[in-house]
């Protein structure tokens, strides 16, 4: 299947470059780190093995020998989304660990693909007509029964899990998930400069996206630039009047309009 498995990895690179100003030396260091993992994987996983065995060995390497993991105590920190931090500490969240795992799998020609599941990123393995699902949190296989429990927990009791929810992710939806997680983390940590730079890049490619403009308004409000923030909020309310966020912002808009601060 022709699928851009490294799209998520590339977005992590872009996130790092946009928000922290990745230098040439940083890029070379990251290339060396990920290249080393690929070389080790190629050495440790014999090409003569069947595909299922190769996938199993890759998971053992990634989560066992290399020690990639998720820490529930620091799950939503932005450091879990920065490629340099994840490669250095071997700690991330499902979307970032999954991005690195998919990148390596692509280099090894292994049939692993992302699933944009409601609760988190899930990895889908397709081998000779069989399908299995892997939790990028810890590399364990996930049963259909457990996936159904996750789905009910997210969508409501009695909701039916359909093949659509388990299909290979649309790249645009996948990148959208990463971008929202990244924005949320930066805004929550009040890393306003980084958040503003990242959102500005996203708006450059989608200048009329009301959700990106809303998020820019949230950052501007945190920076004290209320006058400019209200313009973004008003645009979002006009474009998405039925969105629950629009109703909340509408109630706060008049209060914000009373404060006018210049951008500085």
UniProtKB/Swiss-Prot annotation:
Transmembrane segments: none annotated. Pfam families: TPR_9, Transglut_core2. Disulfide bonds: none annotated. It comes from the Bacteria. InterPro entries: SirB1_N (IPR032698), TPR-like_helical_dom_sf (IPR011990). PANTHER family: F-BOX ONLY PROTEIN 21, SI:DKEY-261L7.2. Belongs to the UPF0162 family. This is UPF0162 protein PM0557. It comes from Pasteurella multocida (strain Pm70).
């Amino acid at each position: 299947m022709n699928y851009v498995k490294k799209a998520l990895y590339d977005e992590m690179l872009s996130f790092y470059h946009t928000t922290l100003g990745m230098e040439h030396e940083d890029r070379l260091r990251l290339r060396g780190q990920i290249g080393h993992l690929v070389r080790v994987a190629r050495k440790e996983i014999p090409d003569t093995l069947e595909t299922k065995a190769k996938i199993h060995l890759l998971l053992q390497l990634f989560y066992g020998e290399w020690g990639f993991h998720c820490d529930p105590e620091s799950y939503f920190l932005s450091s879990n989304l920065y490629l340099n931090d994840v490669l250095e500490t071997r700690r991330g969240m499902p979307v970032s660990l999954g991005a690195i795992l998919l990148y390596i799998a692509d280099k090894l020609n292994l049939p692993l693909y992302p699933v944009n599941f409601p609760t988190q990123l899930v990895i889908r393995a397709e081998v000779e007509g069989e399908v299995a699902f892997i939790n990028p949190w810890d590399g364990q296989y996930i049963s259909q029964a457990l996936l159904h429990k996750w789905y009910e927990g997210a969508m409501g009791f009695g909701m039916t899990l359909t093949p659509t929810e388990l299909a290979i992710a649309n790249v645009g939806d996948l990148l959208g998930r990463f971008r929202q997680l990244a924005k949320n983390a930066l805004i929550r940590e009040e890393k306003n400069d980084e958040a503003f730079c990242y959102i500005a890049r996203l708006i450059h490619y989608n200048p009329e996206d009301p959700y990106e403009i809303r998020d820019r308004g949230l950052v501007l409000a945190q920076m004290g630039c209320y006058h400019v923030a209200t313009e973004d909020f008003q645009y979002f309310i006009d474009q998405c009047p039925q969105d629950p966020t629009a109703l909340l912002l509408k109630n706060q808009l008049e209060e914000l309009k009373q404060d006018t601060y210049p951008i500085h």
